[in-house]
């Protein structure tokens, strides 16, 4: 989400593609495919290998570990013929798409407690089967705890809740809360498309109304400091 770094890489020949572009390719022998930190579903790797790409996998190690945990949980459910995987995350987020891919699309993504209630009411979530719960690595620990508590109150079948939020993200919440209260103005620098940046900036703003989200110095306004 660093626009300046992306621009630098583009100037050096980087071309950004999505899954549709990849599907349309016929041959990529000798080309290099860089997988971003959010990770990708297994089908992306399969297609890239088939096309002949050399793959440089830059998936975050924390995300890789989470992908493996979800894949193993899903495989166990498949062996037993029952069970469900719930992922607390943002629908459509790149990391979440990669996580869903570990379950052949079977995982249920829940964004908030309202959605949880809806999925329980309409039967999307089965309260009677073995359930494994994971979180996108950059979500709010407090929100995840609330969602898990809601499941614990209602689940009838076995329930396993996994602590999969990145420890760096989790500890930042406490430090940022203290930081936001100790300063008059918060200038929060992060890419505007970053889910992690938005979560952390919103945390600051909830404690200090004079919090401003920017991704370049050109956005800083003089009136903020009056």
Locate each region found by the language model.
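The feature marks the mature, well-folded catalytic cores of soluble enzymes
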Residues: 1-226
């Amino acid at each position: 989400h660093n626009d300046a770094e992306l621009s630098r890489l583009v100037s050096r020949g980087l071309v950004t593609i999505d899954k549709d572009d990849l599907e349309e390719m016929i041959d990529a022998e000798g080309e290099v495919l860089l997988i971003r930190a959010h990770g990708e579903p297994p089908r992306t790797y399969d297609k890239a290998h088939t096309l002949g790409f050399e793959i440089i996998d830059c998936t975050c190690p924390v995300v890789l570990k989470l992908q493996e945990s979800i894949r193993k949980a899903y495989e166990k459910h498949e062996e037993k013929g029952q069970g469900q995987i719930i992922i607390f995350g943002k629908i459509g987020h790149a990391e979440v798409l990669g996580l869903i891919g570990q379950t052949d699309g079977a995982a249920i993504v829940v964004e908030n407690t309202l959605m949880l209630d809806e999925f329980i009411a309409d039967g999307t979530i089965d309260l009677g089967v073995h359930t494994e719960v994971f979180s996108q690595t950059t979500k709010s620990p407090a929100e995840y705890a609330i969602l898990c508590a809601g499941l614990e109150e209602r689940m009838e079948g076995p329930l396993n809740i996994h602590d999969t939020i990145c420890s760096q993200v989790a500890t930042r919440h406490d430090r940022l809360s203290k930081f936001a209260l100790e300063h008059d103005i918060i200038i929060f620098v992060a890419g505007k498309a970053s889910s992690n940046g938005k979560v952390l900036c919103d945390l600051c703003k909830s404690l200090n109304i004079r919090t401003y989200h920017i991704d370049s110095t050109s956005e800083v306004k003089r009136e903020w400091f009056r």
